[in-house]
Each structure stands twice: as C-alpha cells, then as structure tokens.
Amino acid sequence: MLFSSTTFLFAFLPIVLITYYIVPRITRNLVLFIFSLVFYAWGEPVYIVLMIASTIVAYITGLLADKQRKNEKKYTPLIAMIGAVVWNIGLLLFFKYTDFFIGAANSIFGTQIKALGLALPIGISFYSFQTLSYVIDVYKGEVRSQKNFLDLATYVALFPQLIAGPIVRYIDVAEQLKKRNESIEHFAQGVWRFSIGLGKKVILANTIGELFDTISNSAQSELSVAASWLGIIAYTFQIYFDFSGYSDMAIGLGKMFGFDFLENFNYPYISTSITDFWRRWHMSLSSWFRDYVYIPLGGNRKGKARQCLNIMIVWFLTGFWHGANWNFMLWGVYFGVILLCEKLFLGKALKKIPAFFQHIYALLFIVIGWGIFSYEDFGKLTQNFKNMFGAGGLPLINHQTVFWLTQYAVTIVILVIASTQLPKKLCLKLQIKCPEICGCILQPLFALTLLAVSTAYLAGNSFNPFLYFRF
C-alpha cells in the first residue's frame, strides 16, 4: 500500500486514526502494531513472517546482549550481538543479493547456475538496519533492552517509516513508545507535514519523472547532448522530491500518532561540497553507516591511510546497500573518491573560491552521481554518459530538446525554488507578521489545497510507487 494512493488516504488512514484515538492509551501500541501488519500484508502477506521473525530475533538477542542484566555470563552479550548481526546481514544477503552473486559467478566462471528469482521483501533494508542498531546499542550500553515484546514489535513494524525510512533508531523513540505527544497541535503539525510530502511526491516528483522517463526511453536519433543532461537533471529533481516527500509523509504520520522522528533531509541541493551534500541527504542512512561501520572500523583514529580505507569501505557498502547491481556500487565508489579528495586537498581549495562556484561544483558532481544511479543497465548508462559529454555523435541541441525545455520550463523553475530554503523563509515571515491569519487560515487552506490537487493527480494516474521502495 502506498501513502500516495486513494486507498491509503481515504480508507486505511482514517480507519487507523479513528481506531487509535477511541481506544484506551494502554492499547494504542497494539492498534498500531496490528494495522502496521495489515499495511505490510497489503502488498506482501508472505513476508510478514520474515519481519516478525526479525523482531523475535531482535527481542531475544536484545535481552541477552544487555550487559546490565544481573548474573550475566561474560560472553553472552557479545554472542547475542554477533547473532543479531549474522541474522540481519544474512537476510539481506540472501533475499537482496543471491541472484546478483549467481549472475556474477556465471559471468566470471562461465557457469550456468539458475537464479532463484527471489522477490525482495519490501522494507527489508530499513527494518534490518533498525533491529540491528537496536541490538548493537543495547550491547554498547547506550539503551536498555525492551522487555515488552509488543513495544519492540511496534517500533519495528510502525507503518509510517516501515517501507522506505527514515531509519528510525530505537534510542530515539524508546521513551515515545511509552508516552508521546498526542495533542491537537501535534496532530495538526502532522497533517501539515504529510500534505507537504504528498504534494512533493504526486505533484512535483511524478511530473518531472515523466520527463526523465520520456528522455531515457527515447530513440538515440531523438536525443541531443542537452537532452541527455536534461534527462539526468530531471531525475535529480525526481529522486529528491520523491524520497524527501516520502520522508515528510512518514514524519507527518508519526506526528499524527504522537511520535517525533528525526529529519532525513536538509535542502541537499544548496550544498557547497559533496561532504556538505552527504550531511544533508538521507541523513538517517549516513549517520547509521558512520556510527555502526565507519567508527567501529577506526574512523579517523588510526592514521590517514586507514581513514581513507575506512571511507572507501563505507561508501562501497552504501552503494551496495542500495541495490544488487554494479551501477550502485560504482555510484558508492564515485562518491567515496570525491569525499576522499575533499578530505585530503580539495576541501581547502573549495573554501577559497566564491560560494556561487562552490554550489556549481557540488551540483555538477551530484547530477553526475545521479546519472550513475539512475541506469541499472550498464549499456544504457555508458551510452548516456557518452551522450552527455559529446561522444555519442549527437547534436548539441535539437528541436525535440527545445520542445521538452519549453514544456517543462515552469515546472523546472518551481522545482529549483522548492529545492531551496526560500519557501520556508517566506512561511516563517508570514507567521511572524500575521500569526493568527497564517495559523488559522492560510496554513490549513494551503494543506487542503495540496491534498485536493494531489488527489486530483492521483485520480488521473496509475500506480506510482516511491523510488526508494526498491531498496
């Protein structure tokens, strides 16, 4: 089930909210857990068993990994933590990468091993990382193990963030599982944030995504150098508004139920470097790899050479996490190399040039990165880069490119503005100057308008999944 579907908006969500708020507080986690299972089962009923099994493993290993338990054997917490790592990484490797490894082995060794054709359980990359971080944090003594299985199961299955993040760590919501802010004001903030996210996805991401699909599926004879760049720029906007839209919707839904999830995006396209970009993009994933991979490997504490190696390991794994395909690994290595260069020498040089050129530098390498990310077919990927850099035998620009530019010019201008802090600053100024009008009239009116327009878009379009669902 998609957040951006009429079934979710006008059936599932109202039923959940009504049920949640009419039952006693003590049973609300149970309501969330049951409806989260329904939400997950809507698309993949078979894999509910897998998610529940992961929760049971996390519950048991969490109890055993808690070093603060009395009469605990010396090595039990370590063994429990290792068991959780093996289980979660094993699940990911089996369901997400088995066919990739089989294909790679067949290509390298000339074997003919048949692929298993496994369907990827939706959300497995996210809930595996969440349960893994829970057990590791318990082992490190940063949080106590959860004794109530229902509370832990609610945390793992919580439908607002189950499918595509943000990666919510247990330590950030542990107290909220017992007591949370279920006020009218908090609920209204959630509706506002959800409306913004829905508009980002349905109105902005889907619209510019049509341009990327059109260009990427066009015949070579219809393209130009400018069109190839236009296509990747379209994808650059699409993935941001699609994914940040989902995160906004998840955060908004969380607020409707009293939860406060951490932010996942902070205007990444206003970055002045790639280092800055990765502090702003998918922040929950970046911080996860920092805390559970980079720092345990030694971080920057074991010399410059070891730090460089650690950075490359982290970025290879970041690319690998995104999907079982070579382009994702290349994408991870690409950003790893740039980050290394910025850390070793490029970062200092960037600070000496005007901020405008820092932005241009960052955007150029961000767009090229999405060019790698967007094509899983290596042949199409290489052909597109040939086209982009004038090696594909294409004209610089043609009539078809001019048509696309004319057709999407207004959309692109809106996307550029929406990628900056300008809309937020304007809203803040309005709230300061006219707090009553803004809070009581303008904000609710804008939210309702977004919901109405988004619904109209949904009525005229078919299935439109979020891009990050496949990861």
Q: Which residues does each predicted region cover?
A:
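Membrane-embedded transmembrane alpha-helical bundles that form the catalytic cores
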Residues: 1-470
